[in-house]
């Protein structure tokens, strides 16, 4: 069964405490922390996500799954490492060189944080292959990063299939996380393509019954 990481990007501030408490007991596996710097993507969620991460550390037993959509990856790793997340994922596209990307991987390893690397919809999946021996997870964006509530891009399903095939053929122990536009209508397609983790935000947050939606997402 796949795992579900709930994006709290669109949790309303005035309902945050109750919403996060209800999510905690709904059957999710992770809280997905969407960190945006206003540069790598147009929105800036840094302060909101720092606050949510600190709050979740105090009230939740669930692991944090931090997704950095930022240019200055190193400083953001340091900012969010203090919350002891299970995973921090950075974008391949943010790296200016192989050496820089390997430096970020080393920094995460030194902090005992699982390493995730993400690719945008227009990035070829082959570009991530050389890093598979060094990471725990590849996050495939199934929408353009930067905003919640978008529709899943169908072409990204093939990318997940290709990645899954390559991982299996080379016996890598790497999970695939799919993020963007995932709901109960398309989750089965994403699961069948080979995703191990589904990120879902709006589909869960806007539902009346979180538990029911999460059961359907997990299949």
Specify the residue positions occupied by each region the protein language model found.
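Hydrophobic faces of well-ordered beta-strands that scaffold small-molecule active sites
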Residues: 2-7, 31-33, 64-68, 88-90, ...
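Active-site beta-loop-alpha junctions enriched in small/polar residues
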Residues: 7-11, 36-38, 69-73, 93-95, ...
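Glycine-rich, proline-tolerant flexible connector loops at the mouths of alpha/beta enzymes
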Residues: 31-50, 92-95, 143-149
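Glycine/small-residue-rich loop that forms an oxyanion/phosphate-binding "nest" at active or ligand-binding sites
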Residues: 45-102, 117
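Alpha-helix-loop-beta-strand connector modules within alpha/beta enzyme cores
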Residues: 46-66, 107-116, 156-176, 180, ...
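Glycine-rich phosphate-binding active-site loops on the catalytic face of alpha/beta enzymes
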Residues: 88-96, 139-150, 193-214
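Histidine/lysine/aspartate-rich catalytic loop segments that bind and position anionic ligands
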Residues: 118-156
